[in-house]
Amino acid sequence: MLMLSILLPMLLGFVVLLKGEFKSRNTLLTITGAGLAATAALAMGVVLSGETELALFSFGKNLDIYFHVDTMGKLFAVVVNAVWVLAGVYAFEYMKHEQEETRFFGFYLVVHGTLNGLVFAGGMVTYYLFYELMSLLSVPLILHNRSKEAIKGGLKYLFYSLFGAYLVLFGIFFLNRFADSLAFLPGGTLDPAAVAGNEKLMLVVAFSMILGFSVKAGMFPLHAWLPTAHPVAPAPASAVMSGIIVKMGVLGMIRSVYYLVGADFIRGTWVQTVWMSLALLTVFMGSMLAYREKVMKKRLAYSTVSQASYILFGLSLLQPAAMTGALLHVVFHAVIKACLFLSAGTIIYKTHKTMVADLRGIGKEMPIAIWCYTFASAALIGIPPASGFISKWYLATGALASGIEVFSWLGPVVLLTSALLTAGYLLPITVNGFLPGADYDDSALEKKEPNLTMLIPLLILAALAVVLGLLPGSLTEYITGIVAGVL
């Protein structure tokens, strides 16, 4: 079942790509829909079946292709498969106005398989293999329309990804020398005897891993691909790039720090200080850039730069409450940002408007879609009782409880400032959308609500953004258990 959740969508995707154009669009959508549903069902079967191990190949000391389903992997598996399927269903309608649907859905299926390979990876070699596959195979989702801007965005994403991959590979090379194993074990696998006398080198190795994975996570100074790639990609691709693929960089950091190097090894060192500093800088910088941005999808891309670093700041504190907040924000941000990008896609699909200034009265034209956008915005800002409030509360209390000089108070201040900026760049679309002013001419107003294929995923995501905040108990309890195992 585990291997099927990885191989089935990849094989189906390659079959779709090799087939080329389908005579019937319904055939393409049936294959894609069945593939997405079956893959998600298989992944959920793995999640519910308890811990599973599967060793495939070994190429030498610690160089194993190995899968292990642990509590962390299960959390990410649920998020990945839920959001990927919902965005895929939305794409059935959205991609009508794009050319070469077959290519999009083929790669969409293939990347789904690589993501399951990532969340179920049992060691860093396996993780790196699927991480590279994901990076390469997701490029066509960005440069789909082959415009000059799309090609630029896709190549920028690729080059940044390759640079990050080299940094991670550097780290793996040295970890293989100084670790008992490259398998993911809570607390880390470093061999104290081998590390003795090489502590400075190992700190560089740890930082190399963090920086390498920060490319996907969008942390400064390696964030620039995000605002270039998102505006040119189709909306479903933007939704999963921001909601899911960015999180694979986050998961890579978690596996590196908490399951290989060990949190205690970098605690109180320059690595932790630089990591916290870059994360906080990115939180503020991303919010400011989003606030100033006039293009709707680019504004949401800068928002992802900021919000993903909320997660990274929580992880960098190496503190239980902060890590709980970080993992909660992984879940909440995936849902919220997918909803926001799909809302933006709905506006573009129905009106062809991309600039924020052109959205006056949009709430009167498509009220359901804009209410979905509004609920997701409230959650991202952190307005109680929506989900974002819960994760940000844990992040702030974790920072205060950490006792780390400067960061224990600077962190909450930056998070609060960012929340205010988030309100400043998200809510005007709602306000101007529903209250366009007395000079707005609605005499020729035409309802432009999308059909159910687009609306149902939007409604589900918007509902989750609120319900997960109203009923956070089970999720928080599960995440607290994960954190207790690594800190």
State the predicted function of each range.
Residues 1-4, 11-106, 186-189, 479-486:
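Transmembrane helix-loop-helix hairpins at membrane boundaries of multipass inner-membrane proteins
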Residues 2, 240-249, 451-455, 459:
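Select subsegments of transmembrane alpha-helices in polytopic membrane proteins
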Residues 5-6, 217, 223, 381, ...:
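Hydrophobic alpha-helical transmembrane segments of integral membrane proteins
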Residues 23-34, 152-162, 366-372, 451-460:
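Alpha-helical transmembrane segments and their helix-start/interface "positive-inside/aromatic belt" motifs
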Residues 38-50, 170-176, 250, 380-384, ...:
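C-terminal TM-helix exit segments that contain a strictly Trp-centered aromatic cap at the helix terminus
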Residues 86-96, 102, 112-127, 137-432:
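Hydrophobic transmembrane alpha-helices and their helix-loop junctions in integral membrane proteins
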Residues 188-189, 233, 364-368, 419, ...:
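Cytoplasmic/organellar membrane-interface segments at the starts of transmembrane helices
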